[in-house]
Each structure stands twice: as structure tokens, then as C-alpha cells.
Amino acid sequence: MKIEIVVIGKLKEYIRPAVKEYIKMLSSFAEIKLTQIKHAKGYKDFDKSLKKEAEGIISQLKESDYVILLDQSGRSCDSISFANHFHQLIQINSSIVFVIGGPFGVDESLKKRANELLSLSDLTFTHQLAVVILLEQLFRAFKIINNQKYHY
């Protein structure tokens, strides 16, 4: 099972240790790849920046990738529901790509390419923190799927 997490921008120093730790913990369940896409800078309007970022992401996706875009308008669920849904997805998809947009959101073309939209919470998080939260939920999901204890 291959899982890729694509995020706009370079991860900040204080986020990297948590990301590294979760990727290490997840390695017994899946191959995790983190891809950081450069912010599209130099554009005076956000729409052009978002379009450029989306083009960069979409160009790296394979047609067979199952793409889940993290977006505030996406479907929300609790950890058990996420684990159950994720379990179904990994049984039929060999490659799942989670996409986390930058601080200004994502272009509509990326939403159209996504197979589904997922909201991590009704709360708003920085895209940097969303990476850590997603990794934690993936780890929790694998523990639930495999009937393993998590932290209790």
C-alpha cells in the first residue's frame, strides 16, 4: 500500500519532528511519501497562484491514483468512520494520494480531479498542522483496522 501526502509549501522546522515520527510509526502499515510543492509566488492575484500550484500537483498525479483533497467543504467524519472508509479504499486502491492545499486554498481544477473531498474538522488548521493531524488519523485508522490498541 502506497500513501502519498502532497502539501503546498515547505514544512516548518517545528512541524518536521512530528511528521517524521508519524511516518516512522506508519511504516509498518504502508509506504508513506511526503511531497512538498513550492508555493507559486510572484503572482499578484491569488487565483493565478492557486492555478499554478494545482497544475504542479495534477501533473504529478497518475490516472490510477485515488485522490483525497483535504478541504473545509469536504465530508467530515469521526475516527472510526474514517478508519472504516479508509479500510474500504485500501482494499481497492493501490495508491492513495492526500492533497493539502496552501494557506489560500486550492484551485477548482484540483477539486475536480479529486475523487473525494475530506474535512479534518469544523475547526480551521494551518496546512502545516493539517499534515500532522492527517498522519495521526492515518496511524489511528491502521490501528483500528488491525484491531490493535492505540494509546490505552
From Swiss-Prot:
Q: Which GO terms describe its cellular component?
A: cytoplasm
UniProt keywords (A-Z) are: Cytoplasm, Methyltransferase, rRNA processing, S-adenosyl-L-methionine, Transferase
Location comes to: Cytoplasm
Q: Which domain of life is it from?
A: Bacteria
Question: What SUPFAM superfamilies is this protein classified in?
Answer: alpha/beta knot (SSF75217)
What Pfam families has UniProt attached to this entry? SPOUT_MTase
MF terms (GO), sorted A to Z:
rRNA (pseudouridine-N3-)-methyltransferase activity
Enzyme class name: transferase
Quote the EC number. Answer: 2.1.1.177
Sites where the protein binds S-adenosyl-L-methionine: L70, G101, L120, S121, D122, L123, T124, F125
Q: Which reaction does it catalyse?
A: pseudouridine(1915) in 23S rRNA + S-adenosyl-L-methionine = N(3)-methylpseudouridine(1915) in 23S rRNA + S-adenosyl-L-homocysteine + H(+)
Q: Which CDD domains match?
A: RlmH-like
The task this protein performs is described as:
Specifically methylates the pseudouridine at position 1915 (m3Psi1915) in 23S rRNA.
Subunit arrangement?
Homodimer.
The UniProt entry's sequence similarity note says:
Belongs to the RNA methyltransferase RlmH family.
Q: What's the protein called, per UniProt? A: Ribosomal RNA large subunit methyltransferase H
- Species classification: Bacteria, Thermotogati, Thermotogota, Thermotogae, Thermotogales
